[in-house]
């Protein structure tokens, strides 16, 4: 309801759930910077109604398992072990639906590109 009503509390909740414990406590490689407030500011720049539409589309998508089973190319699933938005269990289930998929688990939350950008890059280099 918060996202539907453009209540910024929805963004605060999602941003909190997107970061690992270290990411919530600063976690930025540059002194004086914070991952949490950087992520929140990005969400706050979203035009009215767009954030809710994004969440609603994710929530309504039900073809994931069928689509995953149809994947035939080499696949790498990169997951964050502290991801509260798309939990590790769900990510492993997707990987399990794709024949031959590999999983790399990183020490981060959903915001893996801000928390562990070099580790994400290293993971991607293993498949390209």
Q: Predicted regions span which residues?
A:
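Catalytic active-site module of serine/aspartate enzymes centered on a nucleophile-bearing elbow/loop
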Residues: 99-128
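Conserved alpha/beta-hydrolase catalytic His-Asp/Glu region
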Residues: 2-69
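Hydrophobic alpha-helical packing elements
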Residues: 10, 51-54, 94, 113, ...
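Short alpha-helix in the alpha/beta-hydrolase fold that links the catalytic acid
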Residues: 73, 87-96
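Residue-level signal for the nucleotide or nucleotide-sugar donor/cofactor binding architecture
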Residues: 46, 86-89, 115
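Short beta-strand/loop motif that positions the catalytic acidic residue
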Residues: 71, 77-79, 83
